């Protein structure tokens, strides 16, 4: 959010940080916030165990704030929003704890119409403002912005519409 508001290149910032050998470039690709089915639960458990004496509560608040800022930014754009897949990691068949899923649910709570392309959602129940689509062409049709936690090959031809934090996709 800091870099986005100042028009800084996230790619250049990350690459600069990765030059430090203690950090490296192996696992440093931002997303809409950390998630998944283990990390959020484990982070909260550790924060509960060690309380305010450690940095973990600040990390949890920062992650929640990151998603909140992304949601507010998307709403402020006043665009027709689509979401490509709700999973946290590429090739995963699980969306538990996904930041993209959290973003969808917040948009849904506000009654914002969103079309979603994700085969895993076929049996899920959503409010009227959420529509499931079956093809990339349907996803692309009549939309301004496509939210994608990761840049998939399927999205390359419409990448100019994709809103992602994936700097290597």
Task: Pin down the residues of each PLM region.
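Structural/interface elements that position substrates and couple domains in central-metabolism enzymes
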Residues: 1-169
């Amino acid at each position: 959010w800091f870099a986005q508001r100042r028009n800084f290149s996230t790619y250049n910032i990350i690459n600069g940080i990765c030059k430090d050998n203690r950090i490296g470039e192996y696992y440093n690709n931002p997303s809409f916030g950390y998630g998944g089915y283990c990390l959020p639960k484990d982070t909260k458990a550790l924060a509960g165990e060690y309380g305010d004496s450690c940095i973990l509560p600040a990390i949890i608040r920062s992650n929640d704030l990151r998603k909140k800022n992304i949601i507010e930014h998307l709403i402020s754009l006043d665009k027709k929003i689509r979401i490509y897949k709700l999973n946290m990691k590429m090739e995963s068949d699980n969306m538990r704890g996904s930041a993209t899923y959290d973003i969808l649910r917040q948009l849904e709570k506000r009654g914002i119409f969103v079309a979603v392309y994700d085969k895993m959602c076929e049996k899920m129940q959503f409010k009227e403002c959420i529509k499931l689509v079956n093809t990339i062409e349907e996803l692309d049709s009549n939309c301004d912005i496509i939210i994608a936690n990761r840049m998939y090959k399927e999205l390359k031809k419409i990448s100019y519409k994709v809103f992602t934090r994936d700097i290597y996709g």
